[in-house]
Amino acid sequence: MAQWIMLLLLTCLGCIKGEFFTSIGQMTDLIYAEKDLVQSLKAYIQEEETKLSKIKSWAETMESLTVKSTSDPEGYLAHPVNAYKLVKRLNKEWLELENLVLEDMTKGFITNLTVQRQFFPNEEDETGAAKALMRLQDTYKLDSETISKGEFPGTKYRSTLTVDDCFGMGKTAYSDGDYYHTVLWMQQALKQHDNGEQTTISKADILDYLSYAVFQLGDLQRAIELTRRLVILDPGHERAGSNMQYFEKLLESEKESNQINKLSVNPSEPKTYNGIYERPQDYLPERETYEALCRGEGVKLTPRRQKRLFCRYHNGNRNPHLIIAPFKEEDEWDSPRIVRYYEVLSDEEIEKIKELAKPKLARATVRDPKTGVLTVANYRVSKSSWLEEEDDLVVARVNHRMEQITGLTTKTAELLQVANYGMGGQYEPHFDFSRRPFDITLRTEGNRLATFLNYMSDVEAGGATVFPDFGAAIWPKKGTAVFWYNLFRSGEGDYRTRHAACPVLVGCKWVSNKWFHERGNEFLRPCGTTEVD
């Protein structure tokens, strides 16, 4: 039975090799893999203890025997049975003991470990997981100490970071040329080290990384201060000595330059806020707005706008099925109009969709704006799969339901996409519609007319869908769905619908979505009288 369980586990793990950090749903398999290894390790320990018990028993017997034999060797051997047993022991029984001592009890455990190791997370996964923590740190304005203490909202399990963990985080950032996070995490490692936490990491190693990272951020004075501490700890540290000379020479040059220019402020001194270095500028122009919305800040839903939002029963333009059983519809935003539908998916349907999707999950891709080729990107961290109606009746049923709710046809819509977000899982601001006029898909199916997004899980913290352009934040609620049009009736893209999936702070986020295309919907959503209808 155990062999069949192992085979099933390895089969599942074999299907999902790589980039575990991008999907919490797939990371759960690692929990069971680790549990199996613990059981295997305990079995190995039991075998070693049994072996050691036999050896100890033999040693005790031999000790009492040799005490007797060495007290009067000739008298002992005068007894022919003693003489025979001595020869027999040395010829056979000590050989048996030798074989027992040499018996390798590790074989079963090592075999299990070796087989499973090929499915373990790799260096890329560890780096991705570390960067995910840093992403959460930035988005939700968490200091390193809060993360190190495991103080996250809504968590059931408390877990802390050691000096070794913080040092590892800092090294990951350092290797990426990210000196801002290097400083944050090396400072935390140093703080915990100074507080007496047991660790294998030397303070000199921490100061070595920290001093150079601080220098890279432009804080020459502090770099010198930290390097001096390093030299005191390790006078023979070669790099520290040469760095000190270089830093002091730079400082002297700056002082001379300041005197010439009559400057009272060090021009290289970096900006700080409450003693923390300013975060470097990002490639994303709306970064601050996007992250503020993820935190629930900056939502522009004024009381006046709130009065325009209503709840109602939705019958899909008098669809016969929905007249009998209408859906609850709630306005989330007035312009552009975004609505939420309740009780769209049942718990049973959600679990079935997840079951179908999980074996197919692969790293979600984006289309390169320059080449048009699908590729993975750091700004989209999740895994997704595509489900066809032939996969299961539930897929066909859900597709039909979305068709009834929206009044649009699914004949030209894309397959049902299922996505699971991993550690710090996110999808930074993007458009659902294509802005490439020569995209071959546009010629056949038209552009992505509308988005129907199903929330298939609650999220304890984070994970909102936000619209930076007009300041809306929509929070996941299991079983509900949100819907909006990406195009005006004229077919022009509505650039206000640029949206993002915020990083998941605590929890596991599952969603599924359907993109409706223009073709087949010309009469179901006809053109308006103006370009912006």
Residue ranges and their predicted role:
Residues 2-481, 487-533:
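Fe(II)/2-oxoglutarate oxygenase catalytic core
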